[in-house]
Amino acid sequence: MEDIIFFLLGYQVLGKTMMAQRIPTILPELTLEESLEVTKIHSIVGMLNETSPIIKLRPFRTPHYTITASSLIGGGRNPKPGEISLAHNGVLYLDEFPEYNKNTIEALRTPMEDGKVTISRLNSCITYPSDFMLVASMNPCPCGYFGSDIECKCSKNSRKKYLEKISGPLLDRID
């Protein structure tokens, strides 16, 4: 999917989530090879539908901002795929982007560059694909109303601090 990142910035109830949810519907259909890759990954974590065991639609994953780095990247005693691998050949949507733990967000950098993630444990090392489109959204300030018809209660300093939660190296990758 290449290293494609979209960033949606806007006040509350603007429709950022709805726009993100529509992205998989305008992407090309999965090829047979992509479909089998996605199906294998979902099979490992027991996420296949019994009535339709082959996944034919591009994944759309939207983890909560409280997710840990290991749940996002993958891990465990017997390493399992994380959200980035479950989003392989699809979309990973991170809503309320600045609310994610900084270490969790920074953990995305290498897998995004490589299109894969390697999880090492004492007795094993496994690599899962992680070629996904990252779509992140955020409000322009902590209260979410800056720029809208509703009065923003945030100070200029709190808005600046809120926007600075996103690192420069990650912003460099955003379209």
Task: Identify the residue ranges that each predicted region occupies.
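Conserved alpha-helical scaffold flanking the Walker A/P-loop in AAA+ ATPase domains
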Residues: 53-59, 66-92, 125
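AAA+/SF3 P-loop NTPase mechanochemical coupling elements
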Residues: 60-61, 80, 85-89, 119-140, ...
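Conserved nucleotide-binding/hydrolysis micro-motifs of P-loop NTPases
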Residues: 13-15, 26-28, 42, 98-99, ...
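Walker A/P-loop
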Residues: 3-50, 114
